[in-house]
């Protein structure tokens, strides 16, 4: 059975940091503008990067980019994440990646 998407109001930054340490992977948040599964929303998805990427089913959504950033800023600050623009080969709905 495929994991259902879990929409949360904000990411739990302590849980993310603890899991990243436990599994020895780098947390990453990818921000999207109106992806296919949320065509009217801005979405932030949580991933863990390493030798293999772990895709989680946890997302934060916002009606605007500003609202989305407001919701994810605590985790960005807590983890000291840095913003990267989308890469040329990325899906057009990807806005940015935080590492």
Label the model's feature ranges.
Residues 2-41, 73-81:
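Short N-terminal "domain-start" leader segments
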Residues 17, 49-53, 92-95, 99:
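Cysteine-rich, disulfide-bonded extracellular modules and peptides in secreted proteins
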Residues 21, 27, 41-46, 60-65, ...:
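N-terminal, helix-rich and Lys/Arg-enriched segments in bacterial and organellar proteins
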Residues 35-54:
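Short aromatic-glycine-(Arg/Gly/Cys) micro-motifs in beta-strand/loop hairpins
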Residues 57-83:
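A short, charged, amphipathic alpha-helix used as a generic interaction element across diverse proteins
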Residues 79-99:
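Short, mixed-charge low-complexity intrinsically disordered segments
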């Amino acid at each position: 059975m495929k994991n259902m998407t879990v929409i949360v109001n904000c990411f739990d930054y302590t849980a993310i940091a603890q899991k990243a340490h436990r599994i020895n992977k780098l947390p990453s948040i990818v921000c999207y503008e109106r992806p296919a599964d949320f065509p009217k929303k801005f979405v932030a998805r949580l991933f863990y990067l390493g030798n293999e990427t772990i895709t989680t089913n946890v997302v934060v959504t916002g009606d605007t980019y500003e609202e989305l950033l407001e919701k994810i800023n605590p985790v960005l600050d807590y983890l000291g994440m840095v913003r990267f623009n989308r890469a040329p080969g990325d899906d057009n709905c990807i806005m940015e990646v935080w590492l």
